[in-house]
Regions:
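Conserved beta-strand and immediately adjacent loop positions that scaffold enzyme active sites
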Residues: 31, 199, 229
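Fold-level recognition of mixed alpha/beta catalytic cores in primary-metabolism enzymes, strongest
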Residues: 1-65
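C-terminal nucleotide
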Residues: 40-188, 203-244
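Short beta-strand->loop micro-motif that forms the acidic, two-metal-ion catalytic signature
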Residues: 197-203
Length: 244
């Protein structure tokens, strides 16, 4: 398959999610699945669906997936609400600050200029989007430089913003990421997917996953009475035919 064919596959899967399932999600998950490359992260520009593969230094960290076992029962309706809130924020900024095609193109200075025209919820959602764009750019720089500590710190800052400004986290996700980040071998952690339950990831020192898993398991079980799941993963290729 060519990258063009994989792009078409991602677009088709996205249409199924938004048109049939009726969740107004972005196309990041479909892109990550269809266009993944072994040993690389994927930098996606959602405005025009352009993308870049960014090499991961394989010896720098491992990805520890942590499953809270909490079903994401609110993810669909709440995710649609976040999309609506972002559109409302964008409309205010276009009318009262400057006319830009995407919310992600605004700056912290633009949000300050909007003043009280943005409601508290609108400001929180816009703040997450604007600051997340800055974090992504900084994260790519750190990843290219092999600066895993800065990369991990940005990942955890992303989680905190997702929880406080975008409000798609939950107690289970906050606790499991905080427990992971309290371990010396962890560089950073954040929720994955739509939030409201499901999994988080932690970036951990190579070969040190078990030293993170045990205290996280004990702390999470003591808090919620649930045994979380764990798995160490690495960046692999996208979908392909398996032979024999």
């Amino acid at each position: 398959e060519t990258e063009l064919e994989r792009l078409a596959l991602a677009q088709l899967a996205h249409r199924a999610e938004t048109g049939y399932v009726q969740v107004e999600c972005g196309i990041m998950d479909q892109f990550a699945s269809a266009l993944a490359r072994a040993g690389h992260a994927l930098l996606l520009h959602c405005a025009d669906e352009s993308f870049e593969h960014v090499a991961i230094h394989g010896s720098d960290f491992e990805v520890l997936v942590m499953d809270t076992k909490k079903p994401r029962t609110l993810a669909g309706s709440a995710f649609n609400a976040r999309v609506r809130e972002c559109r409302e924020s964008h409309a205010v900024l276009r009318e009262h600050v400057r006319d830009l095609p995407w919310l992600a193109q605004y700056t912290a200075e633009d949000l300050a200029r909007a003043g009280e025209r943005l409601s508290g919820v609108q400001r929180a959602r816009a703040t997450h989007v604007v600051e997340e764009m800055e974090r992504v750019a900084s994260a790519v720089t750190a990843l290219v430089a092999g600066d895993v500590r800065t990369f991990g710190a940005l990942v955890h800052a992303s989680h905190r913003s997702t929880a406080t400004h975008y409000a798609v986290s939950c107690d289970e996700l906050d606790v499991i990421t905080d427990l992971a980040c309290a371990q010396p071998a962890t560089f950073g952690a954040r929720l994955t997917g739509a939030g409201f339950g499901g999994c988080a990831i932690a970036l951990v020192e190579p070969g040190a996953a078990e030293s993170v898993v045990e205290p996280v398991r004990e702390g999470f079980r003591a808090r919620f009475g649930v045994e979380p799941g764990f798995r160490v993963l690495h960046a692999g290729p996208g979908p392909r035919e398996l032979q024999g």
